[in-house]
A protein has these predicted regions:
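Acidic, Mg2+-coordinating phosphoryl-transfer loop and its flanking beta/alpha structural elements
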Residues: 111, 118-158
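Generic recognition of short, well-ordered alpha-helical segments
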Residues: 76-80, 106, 136
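Glycine-rich phosphate-binding loop signature in dinucleotide/nucleotide-binding domains
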Residues: 5, 61, 114-120
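A short, conserved beta-to-alpha structural element at the edge of catalytic cores
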Residues: 38-46, 148-163
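Short loop-to-alpha-helix "cap/lid" segments that border enzyme active sites
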Residues: 102-115
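Alpha-helical substrate-recognition element adjacent to the catalytic core
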Residues: 2-101
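Short low-complexity, flexible loop/linker segments enriched in glycine and/or proline
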Residues: 81, 106-107, 156-161
Length: 163
C-alpha cells in the first residue's frame, strides 16, 4: 500500500541513461574485462542532455530515486558526479560489491520494494531487459534510447551482473 501523502517516485538509471559511458567502453572490449578501470573512469562521464532534462522535469512532481548497477564501492564518485552536474538529490540504490546477478533481477527487486510504500511513477533505463521485465511487472517505463548501444555493455549487464 503506497503512502499517498508522499510524492510519487521517478526512478532513473545512471549509465547510458544519465551518464554517457562511451569513453570507457574500451575497458569492456578486452578480455578479461577491466572493471576497475571502467568504474574508475565514471567521474569523467559527460551527462546526456536528454536524461538530465527529464530528471529535472520529473523532480517538479516526483521524488527522484537513482537505481544503478554500479557497485557500492562507486558511491562517492557517483554522488559527486550527480552533484557536479546539478542533478536533483535523491536516494541512490547501488549493487552490492559482490552481487553478480543480472541487472534486470536486482533492479526489479528494488522497484518492487519501492512500490510497497510509494507510487512508482516511472522507471527510466536504457537496458531493454530491465525495461521488459519492469513493464511485465506493471511498472511504467521510459526507455532511454539516446545512447549508442554497446554490445559489450549489454553482455556485461545481463551475463556478468556488473553494471
Amino acid at each position: 500500500v503506497s503512502d499517498s501523502s508522499r510524492p510519487p517516485v521517478a526512478v532513473f538509471d545512471l549509465d547510458n541513461t544519465l551518464a554517457d559511458t562511451a569513453h570507457r567502453q574500451r575497458f569492456l572490449e578486452r578480455r578479461p574485462r577491466h572493471w576497475d578501470a571502467f568504474f574508475a573512469a565514471a567521474p569523467h562521464d559527460p551527462p546526456f542532455v536528454e536524461g538530465v532534462a527529464l530528471v529535472r522535469e520529473s523532480a517538479e512532481e516526483c521524488e527522484i530515486v537513482y537505481l544503478t548497477g554500479r557497485p557500492e564501492r562507486c558511491r562517492r564518485d557517483t554522488l559527486d558526479w550527480l552533484a557536479a552536474h546539478g542533478l536533483p538529490e535523491g536516494a541512490v540504490h547501488m549493487r552490492g560489491n559482490a552481487d553478480r546477478r543480472p541487472a534486470r533481477r536486482t533492479k526489479l527487486e528494488i522497484l518492487r520494494r519501492l512500490a510497497r510504500t510509494r507510487e512508482v511513477r516511472v522507471l527510466v533505463d536504457d537496458d531493454e531487459l530491465v525495461c521488459d521485465d519492469a513493464e511485465r511487472a506493471g511498472f511504467t517505463v521510459l526507455r532511454a534510447r539516446w545512447a549508442a548501444r554497446s554490445a559489450e555493455l549489454r553482455a556485461a549487464q545481463e551475463r556478468e551482473g556488473r553494471t
